[in-house]
Structure formats: C-alpha cells, structure tokens
Design a protein with these regions (language model features):
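Short, conserved active-site loop motifs that form the nucleotide-linked donor/cofactor pocket
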Residues: 50-52, 136
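Oxidoreductase cofactor-interface core, primarily capturing Rossmann-like NAD(P)-dependent enzymes
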Residues: 2-45, 59-62, 66-71, 80-89, ...
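A hydrophobic C-terminal alpha-helical subdomain
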Residues: 2, 231-295
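A short hydrophobic/small-residue beta-strand
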Residues: 53, 102-103
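Cofactor-binding loops of NAD(P)H-dependent oxidoreductases
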Residues: 56
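Catalytic metal- and UDP-sugar-binding loop of GT-A-like glycosyltransferases, i.e.
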Residues: 77
Length: 295
C-alpha cells in the first residue's frame, strides 16, 4: 500500500526566501513540493527541475482554490504593500475552505508588543492565521544579510562605500539561507513546530563594524556613510512605490537611527535547536560573498 506524501505549497517561490526554501525542501523525500507562480512563464525554471507548479495570484481570488487543491501545508509569503492585509485574509479564508492544515508564515521582526507599523501588520496576519484554526508556525526574521549586497535594485556597497539610513545603530541580522532552512524544517515537521513563533537572528553589528569586516575579508577598503531617511522616502516616491508600506519602512529607519526600537540588536539561539546546524554569522556571510563585494 502506497502512503500519500504530504503536499507543501510554497508561495513567493520566485523570491529569495521562497526559492531557497524549495532548495532545502528538495532534500526531504517524505514530502511533495508545489511552487506557486503567477504565470506559466515563471513556472518554467521549476518544471525544468521536475517541481510541480500551480498558478496563484494573491490579487485574483479565483486562482486560490484551484491552487490549494490537495495541499496539506502552506508556506505563506506575502508582498510588501498594504494590500498584504487583504491578500492574507482572503488567502487564509480560501486555504481553510480547501482543507489546508498547517501554515508557516514569513513575517517581520519584533516581539509581540512591537509598534513598528509594517511589523504590526504582519503580527495581525499571524493572529488571523491562529483565529482561522490552522496549526501554525510564525517566522520573524530580523534584517536580511542579503541587504548588505543590494537593497531593492541598488547595490548596497559601491566602490567600497556602504550607505544605509540608520546612523550608527546596531542591528541584528540573519542570512536568507538560514531563514529558508528553518522554513523547510518547520514545513517538514509541523507537529514538532506547531504553535511556535521563531524570531530569527544570529548576529548583531553596526554598519561601521560591517565595513571593517569587509575591509579585512575582501582586502580592499570599505567605509560606511549614513544617509538621511528622507533620501529613502524620496527614492520610494520617485520609483512610484506603494507608499503606505514604504512610509512605515521610512519611519522605522528613523526609529533605528534614534535608537527607539527596543531589542533592535537582539539575537537568538534557536537556529541550532531547530536545524541542528550552526547559524551564519556576518563574517561567514561576507566570506561567502566576497567576490560580489569586491570592486
């Protein structure tokens, strides 16, 4: 008698965290993986690897139930606009109708009493997931180390100059690979990780300290030049970004710079407990990506 393998749907599959999560899930032979994409064109890289795909558009509710058919577990990764609130609610409602049992949600930084705008939005989504009655695991990563390589479409370090909007704040960091590894583990063993909220960060550094490490490891001079958060806000306006979300980001840069976000440099020892592996430190990340940082 053949046992039916649990089927996991990964949203955000073409993004950094979702894509890496699929890479880690491929090592688990006790599950089936389905990648959610918005168009047949975006499905091609997955089908070439033998990974099943479904069309799922958060803004097109009619795609939800067909995409959820036969799915047991959901990795929920929403976009970076205020529309994430409506998208998340409707997605959860339809996931419940489809019989999905476990939801792993990729949220944002902060403790339960966080007051940073977009962090709070993610926590409201967490509460709705719980209210719907799913078994759940909430992931709350701190700042991605990948932002040291690029932020949006811009390089973060140009000719050895690192720009950021947080003055001399010490921030906590996590590698996207580590977040994805935790996501894969929790999706693979929902019983063990049910009801858990995992804040994820393995290292805390200022940008000055990061510049010093880059200088040592890359072998060329790096320096940090802080920028005003006003520059970020204007860039977002000029780019035509959805400003409800980006205004929250702007305000959180100001709070980082002023040192008014409690626990902004907190780190956690849960990665090893969850995965059995050592987490990535900033020095490890720079070593791994020194060719990209070279100039």
């Amino acid at each position: 008698m053949t046992t039916k393998l649990p089927k996991i749907l990964v949203t955000g599959a073409t993004g950094q965290v979702g894509g890496k999560t699929i890479d880690f899930l491929l090592k688990n032979k006790d599950i089936e993986i389905v990648a959610a994409v918005r168009s047949p064109k975006k499905a091609v890289p997955f089908t070439e690897k033998g990974i099943a795909t479904v069309i799922l558009d958060f803004n097109d509710d009619s795609t939800h139930l067909p995409a959820f058919e036969g799915i047991d577990r959901l990795f929920m990764v929403t976009g970076y606009t205020v529309h994430m609130l409506r998208q998340s609610k409707v997605l959860c409602d339809n996931a419940k109708k489809a019989g999905i049992k476990h939801v792993v949600h990729l949220g944002a930084c902060g403790p339960d009493d966080a007051t940073v705008g977009h962090w709070v939005w993610h926590q409201l989504v967490e509460r709705y997931i719980e209210w719907c009655g799913f078994s759940f695991t909430h992931l709350r990563p701190q700042d991605f180390m990948q932002n040291l390589l690029s932020y949006g479409s811009e390089k973060s370090a140009n000719d050895g100059v690192i720009n950021a909007y947080v003055d001399d704040a010490c921030m906590s960091w996590v590698d996207v690979d580590d977040v994805a590894q935790v996501a894969a583990v929790t999706l693979g063993d929902p019983e063990k990780h049910n009801g858990k909220t995992y804040r994820l960060s393995s290292d805390a550094k200022t940008f000055e300290e990061i510049a010093e490490l880059m200088t040592t490891i890359v072998g060329k001079p790096f320096r940090y030049e802080p920028l005003s958060p006003e520059i970020f806000l204007q860039k977002m306006k000029d780019a035509g970004a959805e400003m409800a979300y980006m205004t929250c980001v702007y305000e959180h840069w100001i709070r980082h710079a002023n040192g008014t976000i409690p626990g902004a440099s907190d780190t956690f020892d849960n990665f090893f407990k969850i995965t059995g592996k050592k987490p990535t430190k900033i020095v490890d990340f720079i070593e791994k990506h020194k060719a990209e940082l070279d100039y």
